Design a protein with these regions (language model features):
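Low-complexity, Pro/Ser/Thr- and charge-rich linker/hinge segments at domain boundaries
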Residues: 2-25, 229-254
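Short coil/turn motif common to extracellular beta-sandwich-like domains
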Residues: 19-27, 149-156
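Short edge beta-strand/loop segments characteristic of extracellular beta-sandwich folds
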Residues: 27-35, 156-162
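Long, internal scaffold/assembly segments composed of regular secondary structure
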Residues: 37-124
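Aromatic-rich carbohydrate-binding modules that target alpha-glucans
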Residues: 53-68, 156-203, 216-242
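Basic K/R-rich, polyanion-interacting modules in nucleoproteins and related proteins
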Residues: 113-166, 253-264
Length: 264
């Protein structure tokens, strides 16, 4: 992109007392000392993106303050995101041996890896454990070039619940399929064991995943199963687009990323 602006991003606990325990707010500035912006409300567009997931974004923001060569975006509520929770992890760098998150391995037409079941608890409290914000890294310790030599394993996911979530579908959710909801990662409910299950192939690597519900509004919801906490360490990216009068297309003139600092 064409770097014509310097972006400063701050991630904080929500300032709204009603959401201070469950949401995070993003404040940012756009500094443009070498770029003349005549009408920022028309020439500038911004996108705030959570964890590189285009399903979780905020747009249509206008500056709240104007300074010389600087635009400030200091909303109280409009740039709030749900904190959600840390992602679950597993590692399949070994096909034949158990690694992080793997409870059992079976050799069939391909290797089948059964993850430790997760348990639904509506009273779940926040517990820190490191993740990579829903992303994944292809890797194997059984070959030299993971990108072309890593193999596939059938991954088995399970979520123990007391009963099915009424009016909601449940999905395994993560960047492994670009945060999409497909028949492949949709979970089915095993009524005999009160367990949601899903199985699909994934290439060897280190993966983050979560569980998402989708109701009649067709909106992805990570809070139903995992809760939402202001402490969760999320990554937020601010992209700034510029289109002056007479330009044919918008240009990205600035990008920056911010993280929640739990020690703040």
């Amino acid at each position: 992109y064409e770097r014509r602006a310097i972006i400063g991003v701050s991630v904080e606990r929500s300032r709204n007392t009603k959401t201070s325990n469950t949401q995070q707010t993003i404040q940012f500035s756009v500094n443009h000392p070498t770029l003349q912006i005549n009408n920022p409300r028309q020439e500038i567009k911004v996108v705030v993106l959570k964890n590189e997931n285009w399903n979780e974004k905020i747009t249509n923001l206008q500056p709240t303050f104007f300074k010389a060569n600087q635009l400030l975006y200091t909303y109280t509520n409009k740039t709030n995101f749900w904190g959600d929770n840390e992602y679950y992890n597993f590692d399949t760098k070994f096909l034949r041996n158990r690694s992080l998150g793997i409870q059992q391995i079976e050799k069939k037409e391909v290797y089948h890896h059964y993850l430790y079941p997760e348990n639904y608890n509506k009273y779940k409290k926040y517990t820190y454990f490191p993740d990579i914000n829903g992303q994944f890294v292809i890797r194997t310790l059984e070959a030299n070039d993971a990108e072309i030599e890593a193999d596939y394993a059938m991954m088995h996911f399970s979520l123990n619940t007391y009963q099915p979530f009424s009016g909601k579908e449940v999905y395994v959710y993560g960047a492994f399929n670009n945060f999409e909801l497909t028949p492949e990662n949709k979970m089915s409910f095993d009524s005999e064991n009160n367990t949601y299950r899903a199985s699909f192939l994934l290439k060897q690597g280190f993966y983050n995943y979560s569980f998402a519900t989708v109701g009649e509004d067709n909106k992805v919801n990570l809070r139903t199963i995992n809760g939402s906490f202001y402490e969760t360490e999320n990554q937020y990216t601010v992209l700034v687009y510029y289109k002056s009068f007479g330009d044919v297309y918008e240009r990205v003139i600035g990008v920056d990323t911010g993280f929640l600092d739990q020690n703040r």
